[in-house]
Each structure stands twice: as C-alpha cells, then as structure tokens.
C-alpha cells in the first residue's frame, strides 16, 4: 500500500475551512494562523490603550494566540474569547489553559451576530482576520457595539482590503472563499452606520494591512 503524502498548506486550508475551522485540518490551520497572523496582530495591538484592569473581548479568537498576547499586556484584566467554530474554541482553550484555570479568561462558542454576552461589558474588543466571513457587516458591528462599554475601544484587523493593486493570488483567495473585502470608504460607512464614533483607519506602509479603530 502506498504511503499517503502530507497535505499541502493549500489543501489543509480548503479542508479545514477558514470561515469555520473543522476537523483535524482545521486544527492544523489554526496552529498555522497563530503564526501567520502574528505580525499584523502585533502591529494592531499597539493601537490599544491597555490598562491592567481591562475587560477584553476577542471575536473570532481562532487558535487563541491573540488572547494570550493581550493577557500579557493586561496583567490583572479579564479576557473573553468567542468563536463559532467548536474546533477554534477547543484550540483556544488549550492554548490559554493556564489563564482559564486561574479564572482570568473564558472562551465561549458563539457567533458575532448574536454574542452570548451582556450589554456594555468590555473596555477593549478586537477581531483579527474574521470580518471577511461575518454574516451582515452593519448588523454585526452593531452587535459588537452593544457589548462595548461607553468610551470603549474596538479594533478590526485584516491583512487585506479592497484596492486596485491586490496580488492575483489574493483576489483568487477572496473569490474562492466568498470573503467580504471592503474598500476604505466602505469600512468607514459600515462603522458609521453601526453607530461608532472617532473612527480611525490605520494602514501599514508597504503592505495591505488595515486596522479600523473606533469608540462607542
């Protein structure tokens, strides 16, 4: 019997489903995303005004590394992760087992269109590389705003946005996975329609990275 060959990264992504990670391929994909999202996330985290007592939410927490990094920046804070993929919830819990055991962190299964969280709960909210797959941009942003405290800070992070010079490979990826990919004007419009204020769009020189920062 011939030995099966290892799956390529592209095959793992297709089987694992970036919109909702599933199965062993999903676990492998999340492990890779913990690394591939590291730099863009670090760039965006510098826009947060962390304090030691923040209540922080990560929507679409994936493999859990962003939660861990924010925990390091808010030593006495409380952190919550939400993801609608059971595989993501499991992997995030594994990655952050120590903080969960101590009671500092909680990771829940849920969707951005109906967050299982009370109103006005969080000082900081972040979402990294998940907005592409949200069901309804404005409605879901309103749901994010609902759980953000008055004066709280929200940052949406993505490594691409709709512009004329996107590589052909990125355009094909967007098409293949039916990803939402707004222009800068569309991003601002979504946030305004959702009721956010003080909207700032950060762009990384020499890249296609974007971080949309706003307050309630």
Over which residues does each language-model region extend?
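A short acidic, Gly/Pro-enriched loop at the edge of an enzyme's catalytic core
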Residues: 113-124
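Conserved alpha-helix/loop element of class I SAM-dependent methyltransferases that forms part
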Residues: 35-54
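C-terminal alpha-helical "lid/dimerization" subdomain adjacent to the S-adenosyl-L-methionine
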Residues: 5-34, 153-213
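Class I SAM-dependent methyltransferase SAM/SAH-binding core
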Residues: 55-114
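Short glycine-dipeptide loop
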Residues: 53, 148-154
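A short SAM/SAH-binding and catalytic strip from SAM-dependent methyltransferases
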Residues: 124-136
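Glycine-rich helix-loop-beta junction characteristic of Rossmann-like nucleotide cofactor-binding loops
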Residues: 46-51, 72, 115-116
